Design a protein with these regions (language model features):
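Long, non-coiled-coil amphipathic alpha-helical linker/lever segments
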Residues: 92-105
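Catalytic adenosine-cofactor/nucleotide-binding cores of aminoacyl-tRNA synthetases and other
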Residues: 1-82
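Conserved, charged catalytic cores of large soluble enzymes
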Residues: 61-95, 115-136
């Protein structure tokens, strides 16, 4: 950032336009356990937030909740694929290790891999293709599993603490 090149922004101005949680995520995605400068490039910032947080994480929640809504917002007791879920959960251990070692960029990449996998799970199971009356239980289980994936992902995003508190 440079004041002379007009790429400077004050924190007070930034929070008027953007959620500070987005900036935390952006910086975390750039931070490693080495000392390096981080440039706040607004085009890169916009792309990363739109692609990662909105396109992957928020979209997963939005799509899965829309099916739960049709069931009076009740989650299923069982998941549609318990083995897939357990494998998903086990991968968070590596993310926690990366975070502990301050390898935030690496951890963020792994979290986004989980988000991709969660979205693939939801797309592959395609609850929108099932009969909403005949397959109601299956739709509820698929959607519940996707919501649980969302909770894991958002909890891993420690640096988006306000969002994690909402879960």
């Amino acid at each position: 950032m440079s004041k002379s090149r007009n790429t400077f922004i004050r924190a007070s101005d930034f929070v008027k336009k953007f959620d500070p949680e987005f900036l935390r995520y952006y910086f975390a995605s750039k931070l490693s356990n080495t000392i390096e400068d981080i440039d706040l490039n607004f085009e890169d910032f916009r792309k990363k937030i739109n692609s990662d947080l909105i396109g992957k994480v928020i979209n997963l929640l939005s799509r899965s909740v829309s099916f739960i809504k049709n069931n009076d917002y009740k989650l299923a007791i069982n998941l549609s694929d318990e083995n897939h879920y357990q494998n998903f959960v086990s991968r968070t251990e590596n993310i926690l290790k990366e975070l502990h070692l301050r390898k935030y960029s690496s951890a963020t990449k792994e979290i986004m891999k989980l988000a991709d996998e969660a979205n693939t799970f939801f797309n592959d199971n395609a609850p929108w293709k099932l009969d909403k009356d005949k397959d109601k239980k299956i739709i509820q289980e698929i959607s519940t599993q996707a919501i649980n994936y969302y909770k894991i992902i958002i909890t891993c995003l420690l640096y988006t603490s306000d969002a994690a508190d909402d879960v």
